[in-house]
């Protein structure tokens, strides 16, 4: 009997041990499955870190821009774009838009100190202008140029569709200096508003964005991008379209027209007086 009781007791203990072992194994398996699922969800839901890595072409563009800047610009604008007193302003915040306007119109690099840098043939080609602009943009920030989907500088796409609105905005904001036909005019202290005929669409836009020389800046709060495009369209039509009114006398408006009328009238009056005198 004792032996039988011992056997039953030992079997019972062995069964309980096996059940505990199975529970532990099943718990471990469930824990492993849960950890695997949690790890997978974490890997899927965790955003990939955004690491700013410049590609080789961008790095080459910036290196070229720095070389050109150090060669042609640093003496007036400083090694850190901070400007040099009595030589050149800071370029921090002007962006590639200012670089495009100043360099593509030949105003920069300036040949000499004067009241206003005139327009002339640029000394840099488009690729070099892009490189200088990229360098200034990367180190100083500011407004950028508008590009086509292929990366080229936008021009024709910057012309708006509402010429009437563009004309109204031009006469309200620009005609006091540039004349209502965009021919420009004299300002104080030897400065002047330039003729807009040679400017392309991008140059007109970047001038409005950056305010070169004495020109004010026009932010998007003052003139929306669409409003700027309408102004550009009006300027290009006014400077390119054939005028049906005969000889334009420079397109400067009432002043030369009044002078022409006065001269023609005086010549006619003198001629008439001489003819009357000869008849009598």
Swiss-Prot record:
The chain crosses the membrane at residues 25-45, 258-278. GO terms for molecular function: cytochrome-c oxidase activity; heme binding; iron ion binding; ubiquinol-cytochrome-c reductase activity. SUPFAM superfamilies: Cytochrome c. Heme c 2 binds at residues 174, 177-178. It is an enzyme of class 7 (translocase). It comes from the Bacteria. It catalyses: a quinol + 2 Fe(III)-[cytochrome c](out) = a quinone + 2 Fe(II)-[cytochrome c](out) + 2 H(+)(out). Was identified as a high-confidence drug target. This is Cytochrome bc1 complex cytochrome c subunit. It comes from Mycobacterium tuberculosis (strain ATCC 25618 / H37Rv). The gene is qcrC.
